[in-house]
Amino acid sequence: MKVSYQWLQEYLDIDVKPADLAEKIARTSVDINDVYSPSDGLKKLVVGYVESTTPHPDSDHLTLCQVNTGEDTVQIVCGAPNVVAGKKVIVALPGARIGNNIKIKRSKMRGELSEGMLCALQEIGFSENIAPKAYDEGIWFLPDDAKPGESVFPYLGMDDTVIDTDITPNRGDMFSMLGNVNDIAAFYGLKSHFKVQKVNENSSQLTSDLVAVDIADTQLAPTYKMRVIQDIQVKESPLWLQIRLWNAGIRPISNVVDVTNYILLKYGQPLHSFDYAKLPAKQIGVRFAKQEEPFVTLDEDERQLDSQDIVVTAGDKPVALAGTMGGLETAISNDTTSVALEAAIFDPILVRKQARRHDLHSESSTRFERGVNPETVETALNEAAQMIAELGGGAVTKGIVTGSERDLITPTIALSLSRINHVLGTTLNVEEVVDIFDRLGFATVIDGEQITVTVPARRWDVNIEADLLEEIARIYGYDNLPSTLPEQSSNIGALTERQQLIRTSRHVLEGLGLNQAISYSLTTTEKATQFQVEPHSNPMQLDYPMSQDHVAARMSLISGLLTDVAYNVARKQKDVQLYEQGRIFVTHPDQKRPEEQEHLAGVLTGELLTDNWHQAEHHVDFYDAKGIVERYLTNMALQQKISFVANHERKEMHPGRTADIYIGETLAGFIGQIHPQVAKDYKIPETYVFELNLELILAAAKKSRHYQLISKYPAISRDIALLLDEGTTNDEILAAINKKGGAHLVNVHLFDVYEGAHLPANKKSLAYTLTYQDSQGTLTEDQVNESFDKVVDYLTDQFNVEIR
């Protein structure tokens, strides 16, 4: 909110500099965006009196003006269509600086000397959104009592200082001058002179005879009140009122509309004025809109309403989008003679949603969203009615018509002096604490050291003991709180088991040639459900996504990595090996919030080894990916057996080149080639992926680490080639060899696989090297042969293999 320092001075005897006040507000109440004066960067702008005008001899749109600038009468050439003699105007003298840092010089225009410039508001820094529309095409006229030669700034409110506050969601009371006055008075210990104007009901008619209000659902409008002002004349507002508005960033429109905006700024109470004669019925109500119900708002935009929008109705016809924007059909115009004035409190959540839905974020909707002071609804309505009557020459009808009225909620909270001093580290006494609450306007009851506080309804952000402690701290002064270092022994820091796992995972995979990638956690609904380790329900959806590409939380890391691969491939980087460690979000039907799981995934495409003089190129295949996963899991030192089980059911994966990864009997991930159609959809070549659930790896039992001396005795190896059924897996053979290999078998290595010609149908050949070694002595040939023969016999019995 843009807070006028001069307006504050009307209500508070404050003598601190605006910059110092802004710093105090920032340290005590809310953040500050900016502190500025509307005249910043401008100079040599004075009041001028147009003594006479004559047409330019060589132009049909320029005028020669003789202007009294206080000391001299100078000629100024002006192109504004509304320039006339006898008016006080804004004059930029030679050497003046106007908006956009433009310097004014003496010049000739079509051969005629011009010693300055007559200015419109937009030319001296006013934005197009603030300058009154009546002067869009012309210069601004100053009051008749303005003295030629004087600075124009005081006449336009440009000598004021504006403090632009950035209000947090919990301090909606600060969206008003009243809220700012209350807070500033509290932390400076000042007495407020806030003025409330009383209403004079000088019409003989009763409001209840002119309009009726029936609120069927008070959830939509907990408070709704209305007054009627008759026999008014709609015209331009007085300059003082326009200054209040444009210094707050609001465009003056007319006396009726300007009063509602002025009261909005003063009390934080949004009001809406209807042209009484244009109301289609005199029965006012509030209801939900009908789905796709048409409605034209004040901005002349026809909108299709949603069934969750709130509308104010006359009869059953919508006349306003409640709390957001009025309707064009009942808008105030120059022909308006009677005004129906609304003051209400609407449901803040519904107002926020409909403002977002229709992209109508107004001063009113912002206040309804943050909260409106229920104490001043009627006060604001009365003052607005009186001002409209005074400025429009009308009369206020007798009484207020009330459709609904919410009871004031004033929480009572108890706390003790010892608790206050314990939490804040202070040594306050009861009198000092009570003084702070008195300055805040909070009523107190004292019982020894026990203090019971009644919070006024205007401070709806204060509800519990912690809120009161915060109020004491900020009014006492955060800078005055004692600073005490915690007393504790220092401990040597260490990584948690989770942190160590994540760090180790990164080191291992980077050592295996993969580069780390970080992808968006949000993606499309389709991609969010792809490549799940275990199938789950639908992904978590965002209510208000940034874009259609970021609507759901990922349930796998792989889709993000494939997007990264596609990005690289599109830029001619075809050899891509990436990994990502991050969280996925798994939804469960019986839980409101998704479960966050730490996962690890990798993706490989292109060549692992490039073609050069001493080695041929090697394209990534399933076994490269499997080797990386095996090496990684070996480094994790898991006690349970790691197994790879073929899976033909994963729809995003190649049915013949995919395996699930198990830790013991628990599914921990999967590995394989992505389905060719999926690769085509992502516009990438043949690609292999894997994903592991790190939560399971973290929870799994680990082997105890111990170090073993390297044997100084020689090793002996034996090779064996087996002819076996093609359905028998390498894992089965390795398990059998290790089972019967004996205590001295230290390594088994598969060095050849052959399938094809010269072999019987449905057969394949696997060749292994078995290495034997003893750390205590040299093995004999007989010892090795005995162990090797046991392996051969066992393989022959179990798998019906033929030794080649």
Regions of interest found by a model, annotated:
Residues 413, 417, 421-574, 771-773, ...:
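Extended, well-folded interaction surfaces typified by the phenylalanyl-tRNA synthetase beta subunit core
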Residues 1-198, 373-374, 380:
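Phosphate-backbone binding interfaces of nucleic-acid-interacting proteins
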Residues 47-77, 254, 260-329:
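Conserved mixed alpha/beta core segments that line enzyme active sites in large multi-domain catalysts
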Residues 63, 193-294, 608:
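Glycine/proline-enriched, intrinsically flexible loops and inter-domain linkers
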Residues 113-125, 134-135, 139, 312-408, ...:
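Mobile "lid/hinge" segments at catalytic clefts and subdomain interfaces of large enzymes
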Residues 188-214, 394-419:
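Terminal amphipathic helices with adjacent charged low-complexity linkers/tails
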